[in-house]
Regions:
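Acidic/histidine-rich catalytic neighborhood of metal-dependent amide-processing enzymes
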Residues: 1-26, 91
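Metal-dependent amide/peptide-bond hydrolase catalytic core
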Residues: 12, 26-180
Length: 180
């Protein structure tokens, strides 16, 4: 565990004292396709259709159980000592991690053409035992991402907006889990 000396949280807590918080990160998945005219979609490679499979996998990752009956084990697995031997108790205290598709973007030459790219944003909440590296790998290992490996890129968003002084300080969109 990290040794936290103090935390000031402006998030409403209903007067409660918190001794931990799930982490958060913002993940981006980009899918490449090939555009063509919508009257002959078989001539292209629809990035939106491929991304639809990724989106379903993200949903499964969030909702599935952790047992062997499913191809994608759900995030609830981190509450089990079998999958998270060092941190399962802290994970149970904080609650399981979650993920959801929060935005979708696409490019296409027109409304009557096959999309040549599609991207999604994933809001990922992390529990004890998860790192940003493990969360990125979890998305890269989804069946649809493996299926379209040559056309998919998984990355973490970066904050790069200028401060009031104009200085740009690039930083990852990642806030680690902490518990004390």
């Amino acid at each position: 565990r990290n040794q936290v000396e103090f935390v000031i949280s402006t998030e409403p807590t209903d007067g409660g004292i918190y001794r931990g918080h799930r982490g958060r990160m913002e993940i981006r998945v980009d899918m490449h396709g090939v555009s063509c005219h919508g009257s002959a979609p078989e001539r292209g490679d629809n990035a939106i259709h491929k991304m639809a499979e990724v989106i379903q996998n993200v949903r499964d990752l969030n909702e599935n159980p952790a047992d062997d009956s499913v191809e994608i084990k759900g995030l609830v697995k981190m509450l089990d000592p079998k999958y998270n031997p060092e941190h399962w108790e802290d994970a149970r205290f904080l609650g399981r991690g979650t993920c959801t598709t929060s935005q979708i973007f696409y490019t296409s030459p027109s409304r009557c053409a096959v999309a040549d790219s599609c991207a999604i944003s994933i809001d990922r909440r992390m529990t004890a035992g998860e790192t940003y590296q493990s969360c990125l790998k979890e998305i890269e290992d989804l069946p649809a991402c493996k299926k379209y490996a040559k056309d998919v890129k998984v990355s973490m968003y970066m904050y790069d907006r200028p401060a009031w002084t104009g200085h740009v300080y690039k930083t990852e969109c990642f806030f680690p889990t902490w518990i004390n």
